Swiss-Prot record:
PANTHER family: AMINOGLYCOSIDE PHOSPHOTRANSFERASE DOMAIN-CONTAINING PROTEIN, AMINOGLYCOSIDE PHOSPHOTRANSFERASE DOMAIN-CONTAINING PROTEIN-RELATED. This is Homoserine kinase. It comes from the Bacteria. It comes from Bradyrhizobium sp. (strain BTAi1 / ATCC BAA-1182). GO terms for molecular function: ATP binding; homoserine kinase activity. The keyword Transferase applies.
Length: 326
């Protein structure tokens, strides 16, 4: 979450009159994250989150994101619920941006994920994948291989200002991924951005999944690979195999990975690393002046990419060939 677009108090108060969530008492911007403008609202009826959708979110995609949250919640997945305005719509316009309000979830995201957190997110991710099987809407992933090529084109001429040789590394890896990306693995609804700051816990108990603007239909095991990268590496960017085992074991109890998914996991993890390396790189090079946001380090994902390039077997992730934890 972040703040790119400021909202005046009187404008916000008028906007809230179109909802039945009480009168505005206070509000503040939320600085974490890099994608949309988010505000914590305190009204006479409680706490809510207001999101103004920015650069990478198309208004035509909002029914998918907001509808998915409602669908998942109905099937027992803890996630925010969109509020409807007095016209029955789940989004409208504020400060020239598409805007939606969701209920506030209790909990904190883990700054230093432990083994229990990794197990919790494994269980929640698998249950989300299963709950999404009958979601009727479909959204193609705009940040898969073709999207990575477009991102690279935006950053290629300046990539080496971030790290010498980065442009060549990205070009070579994108060529491998374009030639080898799997097309026959199980697909469905994925979150596509389930980082620690998008998962709330009360102690070691997971209390909710948030931030769905990258959700789409894609390879389920790719979502697993995104989480492996986001949850199971340490601050020095080394893989914590104990965390990885806990994550995979918990996921597999709910939805076992097939042999084909396991075989593809190293390549999927490379793709997951490239995806976040590129979006972070573009953001790093293009943060708007004065934005209340700290761009995330793209070089973290260079190190993770190189780790996965060196993987020779899923045993390197703490798994044996059957998908059981080694």
């Amino acid at each position: 979450m972040a703040v790119y677009t400021d909202v005046a108090a009187d404008e916000l108060a008028d906007f809230l009159k179109t909802y039945d969530i009480g009168e505005l008492l206070s509000y503040k911007g939320i600085a974490e994250g890099v994608e949309n403008s988010n505000f914590l609202l305190h009204t006479t009826k409680g706490y809510f989150i207001l999101t103004l959708y920015e650069k990478r979110v198309a208004v035509d995609d909002l029914p998918y994101f907001l509808g998915l949250m409602a669908h998942l919640a109905e099937r027992g997945v803890s996630c925010p619920q969109p509020a409807r305005n007095r016209d029955g719509a789940v989004y409208s316009t504020l400060s020239g941006r598409p805007a939606a309000i969701i209920n506030f979830l209790e909990g904190l995201w883990p700054r230093k994920p432990n083994v229990a957190h990794c197990a919790g997110v494994g269980t929640a991710l698998a249950r989300m994948h299963l709950a999404g099987r009958d979601f009727p809407l479909v959204r193609k992933n705009p940040l898969s291989v073709s999207g990575w090529m477009s991102l690279f084109a935006q950053a290629a001429d300046r990539a080496d200002t971030v790290q010498a040789g980065l442009s060549a590394l990205l070009s070579a890896e994108l060529d491998v991924l374009a030639r080898s990306w799997p097309t026959d693995l199980p697909e469905g609804v994925i979150h596509a951005d389930l980082f620690p700051d998008n998962v709330f816990f009360l102690g070691d108990q997971l209390s909710g999944l948030i931030d769905f603007p990258f959700s789409c239909n894609d390879i389920l095991a790719y979502d697993v690979a995104i989480c492996l990268n986001a949850w199971c590496f340490e601050a020095d960017h080394s893989l914590n195999v104990t965390k990885a085992r806990a994550f995979f074991h918990a996921y597999g109890r709910e939805r076992p990975l097939s042999q084909a998914e396991l075989a593809a996991l190293p390549l999927l993890a490379r793709g997951a690393a490239i995806r976040f390396l590129l979006t972070r790189l573009v953001d790093w090079l293009n943060v708007p002046a004065g934005a209340l946001v700290k761009p995330k380090d793209p070089l973290e994902y260079v190190r993770k990419l190189r780790f996965h390039q060196a993987v020779t077997s899923v045993r390197d992730y703490g798994l044996d060939g059957s998908g059981a934890t080694a």
